[in-house]
């Protein structure tokens, strides 16, 4: 788990990801990490490494990146911030990340992404 994100939301470009993220991601995935959690930008984003990085052979192990939205109230005068949580589930076949956002009275499922585990 990282405070800063490895994966940024596509509409937020002023909050840069953690420094040297390509090297860090390679080391985390190389050490066997299958799920890397981050935050800091108050917006949810979920992706699997192989969707944006060409990896082959032993390096082709799945590695899901999940950036959590803020759990607290969005900051004043900040557009595009969500109040929400991520729920992670895993079994022998897949890692699933559910994004739940606050809808005024309760949290509701906004998105769900599932990624196959292991090598292709």
Model-derived features: positions:
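A structural signal for short, well-ordered beta-strand segments and their strand-loop junctions
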Residues: 1, 36-38, 98
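A short C-terminal boundary segment appended to hydrolase-like catalytic domains
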Residues: 89-120
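Short acidic, glycine-rich surface-loop motifs adjacent to enzyme active sites
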Residues: 1-9
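Residue-level detector of solvent-exposed, low-hydrophobicity positions
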Residues: 10, 47, 78, 107-109, ...
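Cofactor-binding loop segments of dinucleotide-utilizing enzymes, especially the Rossmann-like FAD-
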Residues: 3, 70, 102
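Conserved beta-sheet core of the metallophosphoesterase superfamily
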Residues: 13-91
């Amino acid at each position: 788990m990282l405070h800063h994100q490895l994966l940024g939301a596509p509409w937020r470009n002023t909050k840069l990801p953690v420094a040297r993220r390509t090297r860090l991601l390679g080391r985390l995935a190389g050490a066997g990490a299958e799920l890397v959690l981050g935050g800091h930008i108050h917006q949810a984003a979920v992706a699997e490494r192989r969707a944006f990085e060409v990896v082959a052979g032993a390096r082709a192990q799945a590695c899901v990146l999940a950036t959590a939205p803020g759990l607290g109230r969005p900051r004043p005068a900040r557009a595009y911030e969500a109040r929400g949580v991520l729920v992670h589930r895993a079994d022998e076949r897949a890692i699933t990340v559910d994004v739940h956002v606050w809808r005024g009275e309760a949290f509701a499922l906004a998105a769900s992404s599932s990624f196959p585990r292991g090598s292709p």
